[in-house]
Amino acid sequence: MDATAFHPSLWGDFFVKYKPPTAPKRGHMTERAELLKEEVRKTLKAAANQIKNALDLIITLQRLGLDHHYENEISELLRFVYSSSDYDDKDLYVVSLRFYLLRKHGHCVSSDVFTSFKDEEGNFVVDDTKCLLSLYNAAYFRTHGEKVLDEAIAFTRRQLEASLLDPLEPALADEVHLTLQTPLFRRLRILEAINYIPIYGKEAGRNEAILELAKLNFNLAQLIYCGELKEVTLWWKQLNVETNLSFIRDRIVECHFWMTGACCEPQYSLSRVIATKMTALITVLDDMMDTYSTTEEAMLLAEAIYRWEENAAELLPGYMKDFYLYLLKTIDSCGDELGPNRSFRTFYLKEMLKVLVRGSSQEIKWRNENYVPKTISEHLEHSGPTVGAFQVACSSFVGMGDIITKESFEWLLTYPELVKSLMNIARLLNDTASTKREQNAGQHVSTVQCYMLKHGTTMDEACEKVKELTEDSWKDMMELYLTPTEHPKLIAQTIVDFARTADYMYKETDGFTFSHTIKDMIAKLFVDPISLF
């Protein structure tokens, strides 16, 4: 793509002008939320007497974005659910929800629990819409070889699509539409809260305290996000003043949206800010090396990043020199924000960028030599690191607490299989969404073109195959997510969250490059508070 074809920012200085509510108003919101939290905590403790009630309450809190307030209580409840057989194993809704929540929290539960819901010919026997939704969502926690879950997805999707032809209760119809668009486990958690709050508000059995808390919780989080957006937008504006890079994608708000989609809890504010800056810097590097610079200039930039010292800027043409110096200054400022005990983590930010430009350099060589990787596996080995998912996910850990140790970062730099599954998902989704645009622009060969050339297929056929490979990568991720390791579970959870963001951003098109496609959802997340009445 000609760099001049990138549309300008849709937000401009909107968030620079952000003014937070008065301290008394914010204090009142916080005080009310704290009262409601304790009321809901009592409800959660009372639910331990009945497994179905406990499961319903846990999934409700998760979908409304409230579960982080009750991590200990939920973990204790699910341990009880896991060890107890006191539930109706003939109730598909309960069995599916139990399976979903236990797997989500790392408990090994066999998918054989679903075989009893099939008839003698192997067909599922269920026509209740609520049960279908529960089974469909549970089945997406599948790993390789779980044929019963593959069959469950195919069956329930057909049934749910057919159910929309009949009149459904409004809340249930909304649920079906949402689920067919994206199964529950793959949805961005903060966007799920935005979408589910009005659905929950329509439910006859809703808990008013939970509903009010969900609204207040979101509105308070939104205030934090807007403060962060003001900070990163000012940083981005300063980059533009010092570098005048008119050819790049101006997407700082979209970068922060992406990071918030993966790390939405209030306590990860520094994580979001650092990761947003890293994502923006990666975007600049990508636009420089992929669409604007000559091969010689791109290689000089890569060499300067390998050296990581101010005098390396003398290697570079003017437009790169200013950016390079701003890059170094930004990473140094991240060290200042982290403080003396965590500033060592900026070393890993530098290493991640070196990995990125090393892969980009390889892709440029392929492009210049008209080389097409012989297999998609070969392609992913080199192109996985250049999609940026590894760098962005790891940069989010830099701003997190002491639970993320030096050993954690060293492990991440070895490319464990969980990280590889993230890179593969992001690369395959990105290529499927952007292959036509990038092929027309003469950029490097994508996994889609690689498959087309190897197998002699059409682009549409190749895209379908790449979608199948994406599902295989999700199965890899689920398997690895369920495998215990010595590293904090937060790492695996965050990596899965970043896979969800890739699924959202590239579901229909390249939502990051063509950001008008996600503008309405950005407004819901950052601009429009939820009415309390």
Swiss-Prot record:
Binding site for Mg(2+) 1: 286, 290
Cofactor(s) named in the record: Mg(2+); Co(2+); Mn(2+)
Lineage: Eukaryota, Viridiplantae, Streptophyta, Embryophyta, Tracheophyta
Keyword Phosphoprotein on entry: no
Magnesium listed as a keyword: yes
Domain notes from UniProt: The Asp-Asp-Xaa-Xaa-Asp/Glu (DDXXD/E) motif is important for the catalytic activity, presumably through binding to Mg(2+).
Binding site for Mg(2+) 3: 430, 434, 438
Known EC number: 4.2.3.47
Catalyses which reaction(s): (2E,6E)-farnesyl diphosphate = (E)-beta-farnesene + diphosphate
Biological process according to GO: defense response; diterpenoid biosynthetic process
Protein name, UniProt field: (E)-beta-farnesene synthase
Species annotation: Zea mays subsp. huehuetenangensis
